[in-house]
UniProtKB/Swiss-Prot annotation:
The lineage of its organism: Archaea, Thermoproteota, Thermoprotei, Desulfurococcales, Desulfurococcaceae. Belongs to the universal ribosomal protein uS19 family. Disulfide bonds: none annotated. Keywords: Ribonucleoprotein, Ribosomal protein, RNA-binding, rRNA-binding. InterPro entries: Ribosomal_uS19, Ribosomal_uS19_CS, Ribosomal_uS19_euk/arc, Ribosomal_uS19_SF. One of its GO terms (cellular component) is cytosolic small ribosomal subunit. Coiled coil: none annotated. PROSITE patterns: RIBOSOMAL_S19. GO terms for biological process: ribosomal small subunit assembly; translation. This is Small ribosomal subunit protein uS19.
Amino acid sequence: MAIEIEIPPEWKKFRYRGKTLEELLNMPMDEFIGLLPARQRRSLKRGLTMAQVKLLAKIRKVRQKKLTGKKAIIKTHVRDMIILPEMIGLTIAVYNGKEFIPVRIVPEMIGHYLGEFSPTTKRVQHGEPGLKATRSSMFISLK
């Protein structure tokens, strides 16, 4: 199944396990699965969940209609979907538990999970120590 994608010049040099992007797009799914790392290969060989199948259907629908702008952004909660070559060039908004984080899919992301690009936690930024902030602050004199 050949997929029609406009390939920018900077993507022409990309190779995944020795295969060019055009070869990956024209490759049958079984052959592509063989190129993936063991964890992703096992996951795809076991089959896709209903949610993953629905996401792929949405992706194919957007590709078929060639939508652009806001309508081309696909929202999903499916963080465990492996990025496939047919997703390249799309923007997928991945839910992180609070909001949808837009993720632009580029060739370097092939074989990774969508959830890897939408962090669920923020880095903790502690405030200044004040009264009752820590045990040692009990002995700081009040001004």
